[in-house]
């Protein structure tokens, strides 16, 4: 998910930019088409949705794009909301520092130091990736996609709330939209509306993907 445990080995990401992932996705689409797959559908989850939007612009081999819990606003806005939900009301100073760091990265400026609590998020070795990612607006990118699009959000997603799906659908009126009742950010069903209630959805690998999501995506692909 955006802004959470982004890199487990940050030193390996020192030179990576979002465009690398976009290029990889486009290359895979080309490869699969060359292997005889008649329709290649890119399905992106969370930040992967933005990658899918951009990759679909780079190759004619993509037949459709599916956005699952994808951000509908620029990354800095999403990050500010996520951090606010975690840090307020007790850590206002830390939130302000995080927002200042994010603003600097969006201007293309590297940050030499940050509070220890934010070190994992803004580690110097991943700042190049942050800077590249902050240049994109998902609403602008989805407007450029010319193939069929399905935008899916979960009404119990605490990381990327369903208004993000609404924003994407508004930016690209041709897109089909579906809001899945009870679906969380990890694409699993949960009735609890608090972060602590959703621990299982994030940590229990035995929980299945929301069957309503599977049905919606399957119907979309079969209809292409």
Predicted regions and their residues:
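Cap/lid segment of the alpha/beta-hydrolase catalytic domain
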Residues: 1-19, 189-202
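Short alpha-helix in the alpha/beta-hydrolase fold that links the catalytic acid
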Residues: 147, 160-170
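Catalytic active-site module of serine/aspartate enzymes centered on a nucleophile-bearing elbow/loop
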Residues: 186, 193-224
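Short beta-strand/loop motif that positions the catalytic acidic residue
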Residues: 145, 151-153
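Accessory cap/linker subdomain of secreted extracellular hydrolases
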Residues: 66-139
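Primarily recognizes the serine-hydrolase "nucleophile elbow" in alpha/beta-hydrolase
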Residues: 30-85
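Acidic catalytic loop of the alpha/beta-hydrolase fold
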Residues: 156-160, 185
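Alpha/beta-hydrolase active-site loop
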Residues: 14-33
